[in-house]
Regions:
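Mid-domain Rossmann-like dinucleotide-binding core that forms the NAD(H)/NADP(H) cofactor-binding site
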Residues: 122-124, 128-197
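Short amphipathic alpha-helix with an adjacent loop that forms part of the alpha/beta core around
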Residues: 200-210
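Short glycine-centered segments of the SAM/dcSAM-binding site in methyltransferase folds
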Residues: 88, 146, 170, 236-237, ...
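N-terminal Rossmann-like NAD(P) cofactor-binding module of classical short-chain dehydrogenase/reductase
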Residues: 90, 148, 193, 216-217
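Glycine-rich beta-strand-centered segment in the early N-terminal region that forms part
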Residues: 25-42, 54-96
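C-terminal capping/lid region of NAD(P)-dependent oxidoreductase domains
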Residues: 2-5, 288, 293-302, 310-332
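NAD(P)H dinucleotide-binding glycine-rich loop of Rossmann-like/cofactor-binding domains
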Residues: 18, 82, 88-151
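Glycine-rich phosphate-binding loop and adjacent beta-alpha segment
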Residues: 175, 223-295, 328-332
Length: 332
């Protein structure tokens, strides 16, 4: 196997144009890690934040961008028993996926679901780990509950819509134009609201006979916070996973007390390897069968070559995409 590899470097950080191709050593898999020859890598908003210098990798993580990849296993670290060389896999990386090879802890690696391509498989880890841990583990979404997801046409949004419907929930989402409304309805949403032309809180209350929704998955923050409180039901849950608006805002907490609301949230990357392995096990048991049955499928908006990472980040930051933005490395 080659000793060097190409990867996307981003120097000290900045705008998308700072990214460029460079060469470095192929990482040696540490104990408990598998080395994957990357077929495709997913592009996620945390990649853009890291590139711009606003989201440094946690201690010990690869400084190379990229949090998810698919490909085949080419080497095993000491103590790896779950995988063998040649296995087709996808994985949640701690960093390093914008490269020809990436090392990932074995517990964060999953088989490519039967019937899915390597491209589709690379679009799974970041979104499915995020939605599973936040909507189902922390938010405790149940069948017959009503679920509101903001950013419904994003990769996370479309994943949340599909999974919530597969588990029997009613789904409402917010998006910014008619094309995105159509995409969300096609993914299974019961109602899609254009937040640019409608007051989503009023629309939600009207659609729920003034009862509100049981759970909200929010990645916007800012002035959405008060409106989220206003349209949650009694005993409702708000799960915050990102802030596209400022993270500091002013709210009236009376609604939280009167409705007995629960606020929670999480970030995925800093979680321990044990946490991520537990998430992976649950996904393999409860969600991978749905993927193999075609009940949930990733939506890929556009595929760029690894050398076109700048264009991929520009598209991500434009927020005009629907679904996942992907990078082709070896392909397949």
């Amino acid at each position: 196997m080659t000793e060097s590899m190409k990867y996307v470097a981003h120097g000290a950080g900045g705008e998308p144009q700072v990214m460029h191709m460079a060469v470095t050593d192929v990482p040696a898999p540490a104990a408990g890690e598998v080395l994957i020859k990357v077929a495709y890598a997913g592009v996620n908003r945390p990649d853009c934040l890291q590139r711009s210098g606003r989201y440094p990798p946690p201690p010990g993580a690869s400084p190379i961008l990229g949090l998810e990849a698919s490909g085949h296993v080419v080497a095993l670290g000491e103590g790896v028993t779950r995988w063998k060389v040649g296995d087709l896999v996808c994985g949640l990386a701690n960093g390093g996926a914008y490269a020809e090879f990436v090392a990932i802890p074995q517990g964060q690696v999953l088989p490519v679901p039967t019937g899915l391509s390597l491209l589709q498989a690379a679009a799974l880890p970041e979104n499915y780990f995020t939605v599973w841990t936040n909507v189902f583990q922390r938010g405790k979404l149940q069948a017959n509950e009503t679920f509101l997801v903001h950013g419904g046409s994003s990769g996370i949004g479309l994943t949340a819509i599909q999974l919530a419907k597969a588990f029997g929930a009613r789904v409402i989402c917010t998006v910014g134009n008619e094309e995105k409304i159509r995409a969300c309805l096609a993914a299974g949403a019961d109602l899609a609201i254009n937040y640019r032309t409608q007051d989503f809180a009023k629309e939600v209350m009207d659609a729920t006979d003034q009862k509100g929704v049981n759970i909200i998955l929010d990645m916007v923050g800012g002035d959405y916070m008060q409106r989220n409180i206003n349209c949650l039901s009694v005993d409702g849950r708000l799960v915050q996973i990102a802030f596209l608006q400022p993270s500091k805002t002013e709210v009236d907490w009376i609604g939280l007390m009167v409705k007995r609301l629960t606020f929670t949230g999480s970030t995925l990357r800093p979680r321990t390897a044990a946490d991520k392995a537990q998430m992976a096990n649950e996904l393999h048991e409860k969600v991978w069968p749905l993927l193999q049955q075609g009940k949930c499928l990733p939506v890929v908006h556009q595929v760029f070559d690894l050398t076109e990472a700048t264009q991929a980040h520009e598209l991500m930051e434009s927020s005009t995409h629907i679904g996942k933005i992907m990078l082709k490395v070896a392909g397949g």
